[in-house]
């Protein structure tokens, strides 16, 4: 049985996650070096192509129509606008261009326009990723026809804690969409958010869910919550840095071939904490000044840090 086909148990993951920190880092970094270049990062850019007024009630999200936040509603961008942003992203060093829309599920009438975006971005030589909410099998097939490389659909947290964060959909709805994406032949990008009020046990169950998928996600984004004023989680306690590193290291051990993306929350991290995350197995980041609606480290800050650490762009 291959590493990716192993069925992990909670006790397996507890033993990994809770071992002495130095032992955990050593194990994770050893695996990381086996499967990846430890001194290279994948650069991606994320663009909000349709912003705000989402009917879902995710307790962390600035784009939910249930809460009054700083986000202003914006309609779906034109293909031309998206392609201009993609060109700028490529000039800035991005290799993958991710497009996010604040929908529960995309309206069928938008699919032709979305397909044009995919085709246009691919023609620039960029990998494509979309996150549009729940997808039917038919919609996933249409996106695949256009050449979509990745679809992001995060499970956010553990199955046990999920309904404390979102009530307008079920955890099983997330899994259904992931199955539709996988069946269409699109690579899966799936991770979650730390700092939603979950326990360590929830984080372990969250990792168990990802690692025990029939095929683990090719890309696993790990977000550190950016509290947004106006949302139910605006005052959530920030997850400790060491806990973040433990989560990344455990993800690397459980899913050795996956890209582990250090995503939201980097603006609040010290250089030293980011360095630990990369040592533990994170090998992908979003570059640019925005992550959908929230700030991201400015390019020059990223460049300075990556130069200090000797990290280069993944070829």
Swiss-Prot record:
UniProt domain Radical SAM core: residue ranges: 39-266
Binding site for [4Fe-4S] cluster: 54, 58, 61
SMART domains for this protein: BATS, Elp3
Example GO biological process: biotin biosynthetic process
Sequence positions that bind [2Fe-2S] cluster: 98, 129, 189, 261
Pathway note: Cofactor biosynthesis; biotin biosynthesis; biotin from 7,8-diaminononanoate: step 2/2
PROSITE patterns: RADICAL_SAM (PS51918)
Cofactors demanded by this protein: [4Fe-4S] cluster; [2Fe-2S] cluster
GO molecular function, one term: 4 iron, 4 sulfur cluster binding
Free-text remark on how the cofactor is bound: Binds 1 [4Fe-4S] cluster. The cluster is coordinated with 3 cysteines and an exchangeable S-adenosyl-L-methionine.
Summary of subunit composition and partner proteins: Homodimer.
Name used for this protein in its record: Biotin synthase
């Amino acid at each position: 049985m291959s590493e990716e086909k192993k069925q992990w148990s909670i006790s397996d993951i507890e033993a990994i996650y809770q071992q002495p920190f130095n032992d955990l880092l050593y194990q994770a970094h050893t695996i990381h070096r086996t499967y990846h270049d430890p001194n290279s990062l994948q650069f991606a850019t994320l663009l909000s192509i349709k912003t705000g007024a989402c009917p879902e009630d995710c307790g962390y999200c600035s784009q939910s129509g249930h809460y009054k936040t700083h986000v202003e509603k914006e309609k779906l961008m034109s293909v031309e606008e998206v392609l201009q942003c993609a060109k700028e992203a490529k000039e800035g060093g991005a290799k993958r261009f991710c497009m996010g829309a604040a929908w529960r599920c995309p309206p069928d009438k938008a699919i032709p326009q979305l397909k044009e975006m995919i085709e246009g971005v691919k023609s620039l030589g960029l990998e494509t990723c979309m996150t549009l909410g729940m997808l039917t099998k038919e919609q996933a097939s249409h996106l695949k026809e256009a050449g979509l490389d990745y679809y992001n659909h995060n499970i956010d947290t553990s199955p046990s804690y999920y309904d404390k964060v979102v009530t307008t959909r079920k955890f099983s709805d997330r899994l259904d969409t992931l199955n539709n994406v996988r069946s269409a032949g699109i690579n899966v990008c799936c991770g979650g958010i730390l700092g939603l009020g979950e326990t360590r046990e929830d984080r372990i169950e969250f990792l168990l869910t990802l690692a025990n998928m029939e095929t683990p996600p090719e890309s696993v984004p790990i977000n550190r919550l950016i509290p947004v004023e106006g949302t139910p989680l605006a005052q959530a306690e920030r997850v400790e840095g060491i806990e973040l590193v433990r989560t990344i290291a455990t993800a690397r051990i459980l899913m050795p071939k996956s890209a582990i993306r250090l995503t939201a929350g980097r603006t609040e991290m010290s250089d030293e904490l980011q360095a630990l995350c990369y040592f533990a197995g994170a090998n992908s980041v979003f570059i640019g000044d925005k992550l959908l609606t929230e700030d991201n480290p400015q390019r020059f800050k990223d460049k300075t840090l990556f130069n200090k650490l000797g990290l280069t762009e993944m070829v």
